[in-house]
């Protein structure tokens, strides 16, 4: 086994040959490299598979032997300072390596088909290989300097991949936004690292934790400065894991290709922040104020992400806010000291969210044949609906991922989220109420996404169907907002579900409208009627096998990965692999890690959390079941209809919810007004001061000297005697002034 650990340093560098060879090949042999492009995909998958097998072997060794291995090489710069670099293998490293490689392999297989028609196919796989290398280097780092180096590489790769289609202005702005926002966090992280080195004199994790703990226990350091350094360290993960208030880059990151969205949201960039907090938790845990700040940021992000996802129309953006909320759960768990629960949820959420993003990519892929290649249309859930019969495999996979994220047993996220909810009850009643309420919101907005996408009929079929200006709850249900302006009659993709008469379209109407059988039985969809073009397209179709295969594998992970953390405590049954891997683990809420929850308490807590999830699903089903469906709950709608006195107040609340979600909680607007506009005004004033004042002084001196010379030249008349006379006159005047001041002193 020791022999195996000696070669662990090679883990980050195994995927690296692909981007290097691709770069050299495209530079020296561009035609041959492009012709053999499928070979590069196979090589990328093969190399990442080697890393996965290696990581699995290390994890198995750690489960049975519970060992930590560190190997460090020292680079002496002078007698007083030496830089040490190496690798650190522990259970956290093994879990993250398995997560990165398994999700990465499936995303690479998926991308081979998804990006097959893109001109940047080889560039995409070069970026992906470098992304995997950077993330593997981050999780195997043995000190903070190495962490920061690979941390920056992860940020650079995300910048390149988010802006992969850089010719689109929206994508270019999105990658710049991600880059600038993460620079704020990275600057804080760098300051925190330097501050810790000033205090402890070491960058190594093992030495750092021991020295830090001794300084706290012996009261040999300024606690305020120590807290400041720890908080600055935490600023980096706030930005990288899209925590409030540095979360603003995450929704815009959806402008990159869908496989990148899956990788960023599941196993790489956003997971990097959670990983770093987990790695530094022995340091944070001795400062109670920092632990409370971590949990506070986490619970704010949990609620904010869920509320912002409520009325999103873009399927990828809705999933992005869902990721933000789930990352908040992980950060909350770490802030509560529940190390095991946080990492358990990181694992289960990664596979579930990767499944959902790859499923959304399959949906977008099928919709592009109908509405075109504009993300505003192909990703718009309002133009979807009725995809169940067209993409049944994608629908099944997406439904499993949705149910998992909702917390429905026995799927993956149920086990991990239930642990976090239970731990929040022990930590703070207020935090527990928010966390449980958000669990219901999660079920609501996830099933909203599912119902709008798969239930009913394909909404691009309908002509002259739209919610008009009215106090309509229904117009919010699908659109999220009532239209204030009149619709253009020539534009037919916007209208969705309006009536053919002059009556207002209301969600509270108890009349159903039957859809023409001619529409259902159409073989082709003519987009001519929608005012777009005269081409004819097919129905949505199921994706190819290379897209479906990764989704099915992720579906199996979503079904069974939760088993690694099921808390069995019966005699003769000990399947809790996760606790074995994290023995001894950090947990402030359960001091005795071997004392698992008994089945009665577990079932009681699980029943409560599942009830909340089912309540959210029920509300989503009632509000978002297709308006023309015979299964629509008209009794419920009539009960709302009778509450005429409260209806206006209720609709104002709904419009507020929509505006809050649509405007991203007004946080982007606040940053734009308070920061961006202020910086622009300051830049303009600085530019004015530089050009008019600074340059004016220097240019003024030059111009003055020029004119003085010209005047002197004119007076002198170009005669040497005149120049000599002027020179002597200047000297005489200078001497007179000097003598005047000299005699003035006496």
Curated annotation (Swiss-Prot):
Keywords: Chloroplast, Membrane, NAD, NADP, Plastid, Plastoquinone, Quinone, Thylakoid, Translocase, Transmembrane, Transmembrane helix, Transport
The reaction(s) this protein catalyses: a plastoquinone + NADH + (n+1) H(+)(in) = a plastoquinol + NAD(+) + n H(+)(out); a plastoquinone + NADPH + (n+1) H(+)(in) = a plastoquinol + NADP(+) + n H(+)(out)
GO biological process, one term: electron transport coupled proton transport
Transmembrane segments: 9-29, 40-60, 89-109, 125-145, 147-167, 185-205, 221-241, 258-278, 280-300, 327-347, 354-374, 396-416, 425-445, 547-567, 608-628, 723-743
Membrane listed as a keyword: yes
Membrane topology label: Multi-pass membrane protein
Subcellular location as annotated: Plastid, Chloroplast thylakoid membrane
Molecular function via GO: NADH dehydrogenase (ubiquinone) activity; quinone binding
EC number: 7.1.1.-
Gene Ontology CC annotation, any one: chloroplast thylakoid membrane
Similarity comment: Belongs to the complex I subunit 5 family.
Assembly mode: NDH is composed of at least 16 different subunits, 5 of which are encoded in the nucleus.
Function: NDH shuttles electrons from NAD(P)H:plastoquinone, via FMN and iron-sulfur (Fe-S) centers, to quinones in the photosynthetic chain and possibly in a chloroplast respiratory chain. The immediate electron acceptor for the enzyme in this species is believed to be plastoquinone. Couples the redox reaction to proton translocation, and thus conserves the redox energy in a proton gradient.
Name of the molecule in the record: NAD(P)H-quinone oxidoreductase subunit 5, chloroplastic
Species assigned in the record: Olimarabidopsis pumila (Dwarf rocket)
GN (gene name): ndhF
């Amino acid at each position: 086994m020791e022999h195996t650990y000696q070669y662990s340093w090679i883990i980050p560098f195994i995927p690296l040959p692909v981007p290097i060879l691709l770069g050299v090949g495209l530079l020296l042999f561009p035609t041959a490299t492009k012709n053999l492009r499928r070979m590069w995909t196979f090589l990328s998958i093969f190399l990442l598979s080697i890393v996965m097998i290696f990581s699995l072997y290390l994890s198995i060794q750690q489960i049975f032997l519970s060992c930590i291995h560190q190997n460090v090489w020292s680079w002496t710069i002078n007698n007083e300072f030496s830089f040490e670099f190496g690798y650190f293998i522990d259970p956290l490293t093994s879990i993250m390596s398995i997560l990165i490689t398994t999700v990465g392999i499936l995303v690479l297989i998926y991308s081979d088909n998804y990006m097959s028609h893109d001109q940047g196919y080889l560039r995409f796989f070069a970026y992906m290989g470098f992304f995997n290398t950077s993330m593997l280097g981050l999780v195997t780092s043995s000190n903070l300097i190495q962490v920061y180096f690979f941390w920056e590489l992860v940020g650079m790769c995300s910048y390149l991949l988010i802006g992969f289609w850089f010719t689109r202005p929206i994508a270019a702005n999105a990658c710049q936004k991600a880059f600038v926002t993460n620079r704020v966090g990275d600057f804080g992280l760098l300051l925190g690292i330097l501050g810790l080195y000033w205090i402890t004199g070491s960058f190594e994790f093992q030495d750092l934790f021991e020295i830090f703990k001794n300084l706290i226990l012996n009261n040999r350091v300024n606690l305020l400065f120590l807290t400041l350094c720890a908080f600055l360290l935490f600023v980096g993960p706030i930005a990288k894991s899209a925590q409030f208030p540095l979360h603003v880059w995450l929704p815009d990151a959806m402008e990159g290709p869908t496989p990148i969205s899956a990788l960023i949201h599941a196993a790489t960039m956003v997971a990097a922040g959670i990983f770093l907090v987990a790695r530094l938790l022995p340091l944070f845990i001795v400062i109670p104020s920092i632990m409370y700040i971590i949990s506070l940021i986490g619970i704010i992000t949990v609620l904010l992400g869920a509320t912002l996802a409520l009325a999103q129309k873009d399927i990828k953006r809705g999933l992005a806010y869902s990721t933000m909320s789930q990352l908040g759960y992980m950060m909350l768990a770490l802030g509560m000291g529940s190390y095991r629960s946080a990492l358990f949820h990181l694992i289960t959420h990664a596979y579930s969210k990767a499944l959902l993003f790859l499923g959304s990519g399959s949906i977008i892929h099928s919709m592009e044949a109908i509405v075109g290649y504009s993300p505003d249309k192909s990703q718009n859930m309002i133009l979807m609906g009725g995809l169940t019969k067209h993409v049944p495999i994608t629908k099944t996979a997406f439904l499993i991922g949705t149910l998992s994220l909702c917390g429905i047993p026995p799927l993956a996220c149920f086990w991990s989220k239930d642990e976090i909810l239970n731990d929040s009850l022990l930590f703070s009643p207020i935090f527990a109420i928010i966390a449980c309420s958000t669990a219901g919101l999660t079920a609501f907005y996830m099933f909203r996404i599912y119902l709008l996408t798969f239930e009913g009929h394909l909404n691009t079929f309908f002509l002259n169907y739209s919610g008009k200006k009215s106090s309509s709850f229904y117009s919010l249900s699908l659109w999220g907002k009532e239209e204030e302006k009149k619709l253009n009659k020539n534009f037919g993709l916007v209208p969705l579900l309006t009536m053919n008469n002059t009556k207002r379209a209301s969600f509270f109407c108890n009349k159903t409208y039957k859809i023409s059988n001619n529409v259902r039985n159409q073989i082709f969809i003519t987009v001519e009627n929608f005012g777009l073009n005269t081409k004819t397209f097919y129905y949505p179709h199921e994706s190819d096998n290379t897209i479906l295969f990764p989704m099915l594998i992720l579906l199996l992970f979503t079904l069974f990965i939760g088993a690694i953390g099921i808390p069995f405590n019966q005699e003769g049954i000990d399947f809790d692999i996760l606790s074995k891997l994290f023995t001894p683990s950090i947990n402030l809420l359960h001091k005795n890690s071997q004392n698992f929850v008994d089945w009665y308490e577990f079932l009681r807590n699980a029943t409560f959390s599942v009830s909340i999830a089912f309540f959210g699903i029920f509300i989503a089903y009632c509000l978002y079941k297709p308006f023309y469906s015979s299964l629509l709950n008209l009794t419920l709608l009539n009960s709302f209809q009778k509450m005429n006195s409260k209806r206006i107040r209720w609709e104002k609340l709904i419009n507020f919810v929509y505006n809050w979600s649509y405007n991203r909680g007004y946080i982007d607007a606040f940053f734009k007004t308070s920061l961006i506009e202020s910086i622009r005004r300051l830049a303009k004033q600085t530019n004015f001061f530089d050009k008019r004042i600074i340059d004016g002084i220097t240019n003024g001196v030059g111009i003055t000297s020029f004119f003085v010379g010209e005047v002197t030249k004119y007076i002198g008349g170009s005669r040497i005697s005149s120049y000599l006379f002027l020179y002597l006159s200047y000297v005489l005047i200078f001497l007179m002034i000097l003598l005047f001041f000299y005699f003035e002193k006496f």
